[in-house]
Every structure is written in structure tokens, then in C-alpha cells.
């Protein structure tokens, strides 16, 4: 009787162990390969962007070739994922709505401190009629 119970228990436990092994090993491999594909794709995109940035700094860079090849490569890639991949967009630290509500005095003070050429104005006192942009007194105007 004891041997029969042991074999009956083994027949119940073995499929459970096989199922657990299937989920741990077989189901992990596609998830790891998709994550590796995504990381390789991200790394390749970063390299392409850095190359595009280096080419844009050159005066006679041909920008049509790399962009066409990049879109061609992206079209041939097939990524299996659970949803649509959303591209990462760099966002400002302050949301747009809050930025509109905030009073930025920097622009006004910057306009007062610098002229059109980026030179700092010195000696700017009260009236604009009396002194020019460089702090020199105006005569005869």
C-alpha cells in the first residue's frame, strides 16, 4: 500500500514540477530575448543619434542617407511586446501649465541688463533718455 501511495503522489507531483519548470525556463527565454532586442535597439538608436549629431556639426554633411537607412532598418525590425512602444520624450522639469502661471522675471531683467549684441549694459539709471545702453551720458538729445 505504501508503494502505491508513493507512485500515486509522484504522478500528481511530476506534472506540477514539469509545469513549474516550463514557466520558469521556457517562458523566461522569450522575455529575456525581447528585453535584449529592445536594449540592443536602444543602443543602436543612441549610436545613430550621436552619429547624426556629429554629421550635423560638419558643414557639408549629407543628412538624407542616414535618415533613409534608419527608417528602413526600423521598418524591417519586428519586436514582440505586450503593447505599443512609446518613444521617450524629454520633458521640461516644470509642466507647461504651471510654467504659464509662474511669473518669470528673468526675461525682463535680462532684457534690461543686455543689449541686442549680448553686451552687458552698465550704469543703467532711472530714465532711458539720459543714458545709452553702455552707461554713457547722452548729450543734445
UniProtKB/Swiss-Prot annotation:
Keyword Secreted carried by entry: yes
Propeptide: 32-73, 86-111
Biological process, per Gene Ontology: adult feeding behavior; adult locomotory behavior; inter-male aggressive behavior; larval locomotory behavior; multicellular organismal response to stress; neuromuscular junction development; neuropeptide signaling pathway; positive regulation of cytosolic calcium ion concentration
Recorded GO CC terms: extracellular region
Keywords: Amidation, Cleavage on pair of basic residues, Hormone, Neuropeptide, Secreted, Signal, Sulfation
Leader sequence residues: 1-31
Spans annotated as Disordered: 49-69
Function: Drosulfakinin-0 (DSK 0) plays diverse biological roles including regulating gut muscle contraction in adults but not in larvae.
Protein name (database record): Drosulfakinins
Organism of this sequence: Drosophila erecta (Fruit fly)
